[in-house]
Structure formats: C-alpha cells, structure tokens
Amino acid sequence: MRTKVEYGFGIIMEQASRLIDKDYSLAMTKYEQANKIFSEARDSGISIISKKYPNFKKWLNKEASIDFNADDISDIYWLAVSIGGCISSSRGNPFELINLPNVGRLLRTGIDINPGWENGSFYSAMISFTTTRSDLNEVMLRDSVDYYFDKAVLYSDGKDAGPYLTYAESIHKPFQERKNFVDKLNYVINM
C-alpha cells in the first residue's frame, strides 16, 4: 500500500501537475493512472484493516466503533493517504469527494493512537486535509493549519521538510503570499 501511494504521489501525480498546462490530455491520462494506483492501494488498505476488524466499513460510515491499537497505525495512515490520493487524482469526481470525511476520521484516529508517529506525519497530513474543508473561513482555516503545522514541527523537532512544504503549498501559495512561500522553501533548502 505504501509503495503504491508513494509512487502515485511522487512520480505520477508530479508528472501530471507538470504537464497540465502543456499537454492537458496527457496530464489527464496521468491523473487517471494515478487514480488507478491509489484505488488499488485504498482497496488493499480497507481489506487489510477489515480482516482484523470486520466492522471497519461500518466504522468508516460511523455505524460502529472500533478500538484501534498501535499495531494499526501504519495501515490507518496509508489508507488515509490513499483515499486522499483517490480524491486528488479524480480531479473533482463527486464519487471520490464523498470519501473526504473518511480521510479526516482516519487521520484523527491516528493522532489519538500516537500523535508523534513518524515525526508527526498525521499532523502534516492534517494540514492538507484541513485546507479541503469548505466549512472553515480564512481565520479558522489558518488557525487550524497553524495548529497542525506547529504540532508536526514539534514532533519532528523541526527536522522534517514535509510540514514546511505542505504549509507553503496549502496556505502561502493559494493566498498569494510570495515572500512567506519563498521563505519556507528557502528554510527547507537550508535544513
């Protein structure tokens, strides 16, 4: 699951993003390819967790409760990221978008189990997830993202580039804060 997700984001989605303005048709083909990879990872993740917790699909629909433990944390994280990849690569497909609450639920569950896991990776992922929430105004969005950013930096001792890059892409770029965007990128380069 992890390898597929990393390949989907790190190679295929990156290629699609670079192509979108030059060759829209090829970019869309890449997004479809990434979506297939993420869908396979998502299905694998659901299958893995469902074998241990037969009510897992009901849990995703808030129809059951499950007491997850530390052994589940990696599967929870990579499932959340694979669902996020399905949503991202679908380019707004409503049949994928309806799964967005599941991403948040999985990420919050991971934080509850072990907030410091993999240098605060759940908090870094929450930065991206939070920016997708349409129910937050700009002040609430920034407050929430700042909270998750601070936690991610805390748990990584400031040594993980991920939160800085995610913050720059999720906040500074859409709000056209060029100086802050460049400052974050320069900070990462000099880490």
Task: Describe the predicted segments one by one.
Residues R2-T109, S121-K151, Y167-K173, E177-M191:
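Short coil/linker segments at helix-helix boundaries
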Residues D72, W117-N119, G158-D160:
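Residue-level recognition of tetratricopeptide repeat
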Residues D112-I113, D150-D157:
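Solenoid-like repeat scaffolds
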Residues D157-L165, E169-S170:
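Long amphipathic all-alpha helical oligomerization modules
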